[in-house]
């Protein structure tokens, strides 16, 4: 398995540079009847969340939730609940997540729309991965992927290959982790053959670090940080946590001179 890592490293680095690219959007197929203002409010709430401003993000999401309930707009209610689920990640508020999850479950039951159960599963998987409960996270990722495959949500199906790879890596199943990362890039090209992605590199550097390939992990982590800075992207909590762990570990394991040399060389790599 180790022999295939350089190829995966090269392929992912080549696919990861270029124009600005957010973490793949997984809510692209909403109803066209959503009012423009609430959509813009939710977009701002998401941006504030990524920047770490959860208080203001929550205020905006709660505003949209109120609008959704008042107008009986299932899409606004579901998207607002999903946004609030993300906000619960920062403080690992699993009680709040459970409350919001019930809201998504009820919405799915009353509307007959399984996508809200898909978002519920995805948000629970993200939280439990962040908490460190790998078995629970994996269970929810599997549920999310089954639902996204069933209802044809290609964006969610793609991104959960990326997400689930962290669980496989942490459990020591490197072969499965590499399969998931490779599949993520295949699915990404199928959705948009022209887009470039920096996000997938987080999964790769975490895999390399867990395999004790500290040089490779440091190189990929450095490129990842540079691309995020250039593209003005903000990793979400479940994804930044392993990146921070990699950065701390490689600094601990590599000699200072080698650490600096790799960092210097990687600043111009793509």
Task: Describe every region a protein language model picked out.
Residues 32, 72, 112, 152, ...:
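Structural signature of alpha-solenoid helical repeat scaffolds
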Residues 35-36, 75, 115, 155, ...:
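Residue signature of alpha-solenoid helical repeat architecture, marking inter-repeat boundaries
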Residues 38-52, 78-92, 116-132, 159-170, ...:
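Tandem amphipathic alpha-helical repeat scaffolds
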Residues 15-16:
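C-terminal motif of bacterial Sec signal peptides marking the signal peptidase cleavage site
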Residues 21-36, 218-270:
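C-terminal non-catalytic interaction modules
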Residues 62-66, 102-109, 142-153, 182-190, ...:
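Amphipathic alpha-helical segments of tetratricopeptide repeats
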């Amino acid at each position: 398995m180790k022999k295939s890592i350089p190829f995966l490293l090269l392929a992912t680095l080549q696919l990861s540079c270029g124009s600005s690219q957010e973490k793949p959007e997984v809510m692209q197929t909403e109803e066209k009847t959503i009012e423009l203002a609430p959509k813009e409010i939710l977009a701002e709430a998401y941006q504030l969340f990524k920047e770490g401003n959860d208080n203001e993000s929550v205020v905006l999401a709660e505003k949209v939730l109120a609008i959704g309930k008042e107008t009986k707009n299932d899409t606004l209610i579901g998207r607002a609940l999903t946004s609030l689920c993300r906000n619960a990640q920062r403080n690992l508020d699993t009680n709040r997540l459970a409350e919001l999850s019930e809201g998504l479950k009820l919405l799915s039951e009353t509307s007959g729309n399984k996508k809200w159960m898909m978002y519920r599963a995805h948000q629970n998987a993200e939280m439990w991965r962040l908490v460190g409960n790998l078995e629970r996270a994996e269970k929810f990722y599997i549920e999310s992927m089954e639902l996204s495959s069933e209802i044809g949500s290609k964006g969610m199906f793609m991104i959960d290959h990326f997400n689930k790879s962290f669980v496989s890596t942490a459990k020591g199943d490197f072969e499965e982790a590499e399969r998931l990362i490779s599949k993520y890039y295949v699915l990404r090209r199928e959705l948009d053959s022209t887009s470039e992605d920096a996000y997938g590199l987080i999964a790769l550097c975490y895999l390399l670090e867990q395999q004790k390939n500290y040089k490779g992990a440091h190189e990929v982590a450095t490129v990842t940080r540079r691309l995020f800075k250039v593209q003005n992207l903000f990793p979400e909590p479940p994804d930044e946590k392993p990146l921070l762990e990699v950065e701390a570990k490689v600094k601990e394991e590599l000699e200072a001179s080698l650490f600096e040399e790799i960092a210097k060389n990687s600043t111009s790599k793509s």
